[in-house]
Amino acid sequence: MSYLVTIIAFIIVFGVLVTVHEYGHMFFAKRAGIMCPEFAIGMGPKIFSFRKNETLYTIRLLPVGGYVRMAGDGLEEPPVEPGMNVKIKLNEENEITHIILDDHHKFQQIEAIEVKKCDFKDDLFIEGITAYDNERHHFKIARKSFFVENGSLVQIAPRDRQFAHKKPWPKFLTLFAGPLFNFILALVLFIGLAYYQGTPTSTVEQVADKYPAQQAGLQKGDKIVQIGKYKISEFDDVDKALDKVKDNKTTVKFERDGKTKSVELTPKKTERKLTKVSSETKYVLGFQPASEHTLFKPIVYGFESFLKGSTLIFTAVVGMLASIFTGGFSFDMLNGPVGIYHNVDSVVKAGIISLIGYTALLSVNLGIMNLIPIPALDGGRILFVIYEAIFRKPVNKKAETTIIAIGAIFMVVIMILVTWNDIRRYFL
């Protein structure tokens, strides 16, 4: 049963993170007028799909990412060229609405035509000889029109609906929006947790066994007001003061039953592993703070949690990248879907609150990792846009596509190696 819960939790976490990321791309793409033929969650074979307006929404088998397919985002060419024989369906204005490429269709009242001239980007027309009268005719293509092949519809994208022909700014927004939406999701989750759990105060809720707070006689309800020479008004002040006094003997003042008392104690030094490449030294008294529920503090606390998490993950990513050049790199520094599944399994056992917190951190991680300047990732593609903005011309399309393809192959190889390493670490 626990495996089933973990699998469901993993699917939900993966689905939410990828959906939010890809929706960010699609939201800004559509605002820029870019046609998005497909919105996919997962990779590989399609297991579910539905069409809404001009976009086909699909769920695919492999939980290793997702994508938004945008018109003009590649070297694809229209499947029709002069000399071909196709069938066309016309609307009441005698405009082409469907260009049928084979016999796998259910359309009626269609015309066969031998294409002599055509333009699917600017002037939108087909000129050719129709079978019914063997005469040459010129047909306009409707703004909303489709290629039909094997029963599937692919909407025709004029030049002004293509990603490649947009200005650098809407391109940048479209590419950056995926990570941006991951950051927004993380911030919302952190703030939501702060509202649900309350924000920590400097009042003692519970003391830990064999820690300085217990040994000094601190009790539930004691409100810490000063550590050494540092005034305390909220829980963050406790951490800041302890970072300064470290493990030196110090005086702690607190309020109990309306009276101010003081004790001397020595904070305990602890080492906490943050990531596979970094750890944190903290000095603690050993108490759990009481929480309070207010209107505005959770917003500030959630934002602070987001900044701390983002700083931690950014530092870890920079450290990982640096280790490639210093010789300290290990695949243990990375987690693929298998590693994330293992982490979700551990987090689920701690409860839904821990799972939400992990999802928030994972969302930050996804956003930051996607901004690494590798050609197949958002960060690499943003570099192409920056080049275009600086030099007032886009990178050669064929060169860009080749570089992105090489980057994609590199990412696939890395994903395979990381997945095998995760399987070896956690299950073998």
From Swiss-Prot:
Keywords: Cell membrane, Hydrolase, Membrane, Metal-binding, Metalloprotease, Protease, Transmembrane, Transmembrane helix, Zinc
Chain ranges passing through the membrane: 172-194, 309-331, 352-374, 401-420
Binding site for Zn(2+): 21, 25
Entry's EC annotation: 3.4.24.-
Keyword rRNA-binding on entry: no
GO biological process, one term: proteolysis
Gene Ontology CC terms, in alphabetical order: plasma membrane
Enzyme type, top EC level: hydrolase
Domain PDZ, first and last residues per copy: 186-269
Membrane topology: Multi-pass membrane protein
Necessary cofactors: Zn(2+)
Main location: membrane
Family, similarity comment: Belongs to the peptidase M50B family.
Name under which the protein is recorded: Putative zinc metalloprotease SAV1262
